[in-house]
Regions:
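Conserved beta/loop motifs at nucleotide-recognition and modification sites
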Residues: 1-251
Length: 251
């Protein structure tokens, strides 16, 4: 029976609860989730006073599998764990050699492999060993049609509400660029805190991100559905005059 794939939310929940795994291989097309999990581990595993001797950051272009294994086999100094993060691990040419360590990892080492924009071959030893003894997570791009619900979910995690139209406006304007989206949501969260408010509205987005609440895809689709040809033409003309404000190509 195939092992159920763990979700981003489940990984983050376990890390927050300090239920760490000895190996994390974070791979796939979407860098946002890989960065978020890695940042959470960097914040959670070690106290600040423990990091000088027990936290190692390596880069794929400057290291190799043997060096990573040697570092992982060290024991921590005056700490329960040591944390090793390998960034840009897709550049480690002999990365499959890591399987010899991952088959029997140290419980005191937390090894984090950032394998961005690619995926390991799940049929080979490294992926199989990671799946058995740690976390093998594939970070996938979110389809455009799922972005509004994803934005709503992100804001719920921050205990902030968002109007459906506002979520659609952000989705249309930013697409599925999650890093850019996260920066804009951070900005909106700060503004809401200053206003002592807990809800993102189309007006808030229009005022602070520069997306028109009247001339956007949400309103265009609504006008077409209601057969409001005058309004649909007005929005189309606005898109033609302001191509940077229009996230889709008009035909």
């Amino acid at each position: 029976m195939a092992k159920k794939e763990i979700t981003f939310e489940e990984i983050c929940r376990d890390i927050t609860a300090r239920k760490f795994q000895p190996v994390y291989v974070l791979m796939g097309e979407e860098p946002f989730f890989i960065d978020q999990i890695t940042d959470l581990l960097l914040k959670s595993v070690l106290e600040e006073s423990e990091r000088d001797f027990n936290q190692i950051i390596l880069y794929g272009a400057d290291t190799d599998a043997i060096s990573i294994i040697n570092a992982a086999r060290r024991f921590p100094m005056m700490s329960e764990y040591q944390l090793i993060v390998v960034r840009e691990a897709q550049l480690v040419r002999d990365i499959e050699l890591l399987s010899s360590y991952v088959k029997n990892p140290l419980s005191s080492t937390i090894l984090v492999i950032n394998y961005k924009y690619k995926t390991l071959d799940r049929r080979r030893a490294l992926a199989a060993a990671t799946d058995k003894n740690g976390i093998l997570y594939e970070s996938k791009k979110i389809p455009d049609y799922k972005m509004p619900s994803f934005i709503t979910s992100l804001m719920q995690q921050r205990s902030i509400g968002i109007d459906p139209k506002a979520a659609q406006m952000l989705s249309d304007f930013l697409g599925n660029d999650l890093n850019r989206l996260n920066k804009e949501l951070d900005k909106l969260a700060i503004i809401l805190a200053e206003k002592a408010s807990k809800r993102i509205t189309p007006e808030l987005i229009e005022q602070n991100i520069g997306i028109s609440k009247e001339y956007n895809n949400f309103e265009l689709i609504k006008a077409l559905a209601m057969k409001d040809i005058l309004k649909a033409n007005r929005i189309a003309q606005y898109f033609e005059k302001n191509p940077k404000s229009n996230p889709i190509q008009m035909t």
